[in-house]
Swiss-Prot record:
Keywords: Coiled coil, Nucleus. This is Protein isy-1. It holds the Pfam family Isy1. Disruption phenotype: RNAi-mediated knockdown results in up-regulation of the transcription factor zip-10 and its downstream target asp-17. GO terms for cellular component: catalytic step 2 spliceosome; nucleus; post-mRNA release spliceosomal complex; post-spliceosomal complex; Prp19 complex. Ubiquitously expressed. Residues 175-204 form a coiled coil. Regulates the processing of the mir-60 microRNA (miRNA), which in turn negatively regulates the expression of the transcription factor zip-10. Does not affect the splicing of zip-10. Residues 195-221 are annotated as: Disordered. GO terms for biological process: generation of catalytic spliceosome for second transesterification step; mRNA 3'-splice site recognition; regulation of primary miRNA processing. It comes from Caenorhabditis elegans. Gene3D superfamilies: Helix hairpin bin (1.10.287.660). It comes from the Eukaryota. It is found in: Nucleus.
Length: 267
């Protein structure tokens, strides 16, 4: 009888679950791409599922007896779920929902200070004690100490360090004036030497008088003179330059052509 009653309760539970699913309607499955979800309520539900899965895995990773490989797998899975949760939170904000990033709890380190950057790969629970992971935390602690010391040094620096108050005692003004006078004298001397060199170069490269008229030698020109009586009754001598005729030009070209042919073939 007890067995039959147990079977009846199980069948009743299955029937009730089936009726609830029929009344609720089909449930959308979580898509791989958050852009495919266009319903705000579905996006909220998917985020809750991811948070629930991440919480379970973070609870499981606290057990150091799981072994190195299992802890590394769980830590990878938690990082993947956190990255996926951030993507769904961004999608919820795009659909007009709650901005979870704005109201999220701030992450604190072991001392209680707020961490500057929450991005990157993280280690949870017993995964922090894995081989090679502890050394990473020690290096990060050393870097934080160096940054803190540098911040302390910069905090104590005042205007005297940058030289803004050096002129208040009046010691630098006479020294600066003396150096300024020496520099001015040196610059004036260099300028005078350069000007003298430019003038010397300009005088050496000056061209001759371009307006000087040179007399032409007319001995090589064939001319003809004629005497005429001017208006005042005085005789004037007129020199005519004989221009070559067409025949003279042809003979000259022919002679030049002969010379070129003779030079070409005789050489």
């Amino acid at each position: 009888m007890a067995r039959n009653a147990e079977k009846a309760m199980t069948a009743l539970a299955r029937w009730r679950r089936m009726k609830e699913e029929e009344e609720r309607g089909p449930i959308a499955r979580r898509p791989h791409d958050v852009k495919d979800c266009r319903n705000l309520s579905d996006a909220e539900r998917f985020r809750r599922e991811i948070v629930r899965d991440a919480s379970k895995k973070i609870t499981a990773i606290q057990n150091p007896g799981l072994g190195e490989f299992k802890l590394r797998d769980l830590n990878d899975e938690v990082n993947r779920l956190i990255k996926l949760k951030h993507a769904w939170e961004q999608r919820i904000r795009e659909l007009g929902g709650t901005d979870y990033r704005k109201y999220a709890q701030k992450e604190l380190d072991a001392i209680g200070r707020e961490t500057g950057n929450s991005r990157g790969y993280k280690y949870f629970g017993a995964a922090k004690d894995l081989p090679g992971v502890r050394e990473l935390f020690e290096k990060s602690t050393e870097g934080e100490e160096q940054r803190r010391h540098r911040a302390d040094l910069l905090r104590n620096i005042d205007a005297h360090y940058f030289g803004y108050l050096d002129d208040e005692d009046g010691r630098l003004i006479p020294l600066e004036k003396l150096i300024e006078e020496k520099n001015i004298e040196r610059i004036n001397k260099e300028f005078a030497e350069k000007q003298a060199q430019k003038q010397q170069t300009a005088s050496d490269a000056a061209p001759e008088n371009i307006y000087k008229v040179e007399e032409d030698d007319d001995d090589d020109l064939e001319t003809q003179e004629s005497t005429v009586i001017g208006e005042d009754g005085r005789p004037m001598t007129i020199r005519h330059v004989l221009l070559p005729t067409q025949q003279d030009i042809e003979e000259m070209l022919l002679e030049q052509k002969k010379q070129e042919l003779m030079a070409k073939y005789l050489d």
